[in-house]
Amino acid sequence: MDFYYLPGSAPCRAVQMTAAAVGVELNLKLTDLMKGEHMKPEFLKLNPQHCIPTLVDEDGFVLWESRAIQIYLVEKYCAHDPALAERLYPGDPRRRAVVHQRLFFDVAILYQRFAEYYYPQIFGKKVAGDPDRLRSMEQALEFLNTFLEGERFVAGGDDPTIADFSILACILDCNVRRCRVRSAAI
């Protein structure tokens, strides 16, 4: 399956971690946003929202939004291994709800605040980050630390879930950019 991605993208890395966990090989299609490759007509035909990551399955099914892709990969490619599916994306409604909550926390709070603080510096050539946005991002990291109190993984349990992959990818970006993550166990 084709996977349109950018190596430095946390959402793309989360999908790559999920694909590796379920044993799916991705045909990597580097998509250079700085060159506008995501705005070319052939890409827009696949994904009118012109975002990455974008997955094109063997049968032509197209999906974007990293967390949706993660869920799809587990549901489709773990059918042969229910135990693996259960570890990555639990079937129990309460455990799955916590995984969803952590995924939504990542997309709406953690990664969003990371992007609000760092993207102006990365893409806008702004040298210094906005102190208010830094405080907001640090607050999101404190929420994450609260989730991890007494836990090995962000959604609890004994095994990492797709929520861990998603949040880990964001935290790796934070670490590269020298954010302060004190007690995160992932």
UniProtKB/Swiss-Prot annotation:
A GO cellular-component term linked to this record: extracellular region
Binding-site residues for glutathione, renumbered to this chain: 9, 50-52, 65-67
Keywords: Transferase
Location of the GST C-terminal domain: 92-186
Any single Pfam family the record assigns to this protein: GST_N
Cross-referenced SUPFAM superfamilies: GST C-terminal domain-like, Thioredoxin-like
Keyword Transferase: yes
Listed transmembrane segments: none
InterPro entries according to UniProt: Glutathione-S-Trfase_C-like (IPR010987), Glutathione-S-Trfase_C_sf (IPR036282), Glutathione_S-Trfase_N (IPR004045), Thioredoxin-like_sf (IPR036249)
GO terms for biological process, alphabetical: glutathione metabolic process
PROSITE patterns: GST_CTER (PS50405), GST_NTER (PS50404)
GO molecular-function term, one example from the UniProt record: glutathione transferase activity
EC number: 2.5.1.18
Residue stretches making up the GST N-terminal domain: 1-81
Disulphide linkage map: none
Reactions accelerated catalytically: RX + glutathione = an S-substituted glutathione + a halide anion + H(+)
Protein purpose: Conjugation of reduced glutathione to a wide number of exogenous and endogenous hydrophobic electrophiles.
Quaternary assembly: Homodimer.
Family membership: Belongs to the GST superfamily. Theta family.
Protein name: Glutathione S-transferase 1, isoform A
Species, as recorded: Anopheles gambiae
Gene coding for it: GstD1
